[in-house]
């Protein structure tokens, strides 16, 4: 019952649940829990205790599901790039609880607006992540880069193709006689 109460509090106010989780008296509350839960708490309550520790505790004790993320689209293309462009893509979350995303890019021409995103930055279940395509960093031909979005449980990749040249389409059709 005590874990259920902590979960209810966390669902309404994660900050308050974190305060309870890190309070030295919580160890006496969890003393009645099964040995696995006590061992889990012992490991996750060691300093420094982060919000992620509370999230992992609730997930591991099956009090809640891990927050999951998805991308609305996974790739985009830009051709005839002559100057720096700012663009964005959408990250969607499902579930409740603490979420920290680490953002990195591969490809010298791509620069995400932020390196870290937290659940507080989502509007409802959506977040628009801005990024910049630096035209001066593009070489000849198509350049392919990625923006990598990592949570403790997932890694998603958003692929960006960019070129200074116009898009070339080759249309191969068989003529019927």
Segment roles from a protein language model:
Residues 27, 100-104, 148, 152:
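Eukaryotic, compositionally biased intrinsically disordered regions
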Residues 86, 96-105, 142-144, 159:
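Short, hydrophobic/aromatic beta-strand segments
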Residues 23-94, 136-138, 169-177:
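Beta-sheet-dominated interaction scaffolds and their linkers
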Residues 2-23, 28:
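Extracytoplasmic/secretory-pathway proteins
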Residues 84-88, 126-128, 155-157:
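Intrinsic-disorder/low-complexity, polar/charged segments enriched in Ser/Thr/Lys/Arg/Asp/Glu/Gln
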Residues 65-68, 72, 92-130:
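Surface-exposed binding patches on compact interaction domains or structured appendages
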Residues 159-169:
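Short beta-strand edge segments in extracellular beta-sheet folds
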């Amino acid at each position: 019952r005590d874990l259920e109460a902590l979960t209810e509090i966390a669902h309404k106010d994660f900050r308050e649940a974190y305060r309870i989780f890190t309070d030295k008296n919580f160890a006496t509350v969890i003393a009645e829990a099964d040995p696995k839960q006590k061992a889990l708490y012992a490991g996750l309550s060691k300093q420094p205790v982060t919000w992620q520790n509370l999230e992992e505790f609730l997930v591991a004790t099956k009090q809640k599901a891990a927050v999951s993320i998805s991308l609305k689209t996974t790739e985009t293309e830009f051709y005839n790039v002559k100057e720096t462009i700012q663009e964005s893509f959408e990250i969607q979350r499902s579930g409740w609880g603490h979420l920290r995303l680490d953002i990195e890019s591969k490809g010298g021409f791509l620069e995400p607006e932020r390196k870290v995103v937290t659940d507080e930055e989502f509007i409802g279940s959506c977040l628009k992540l801005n990024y910049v395509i630096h035209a001066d960093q593009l070489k000849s031909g198509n350049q392919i880069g990625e923006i990598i979005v990592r949570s403790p449980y997932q890694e998603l990749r958003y692929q960006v193709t960019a070129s200074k040249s116009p898009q070339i389409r080759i249309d191969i059709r068989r003529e019927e006689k």
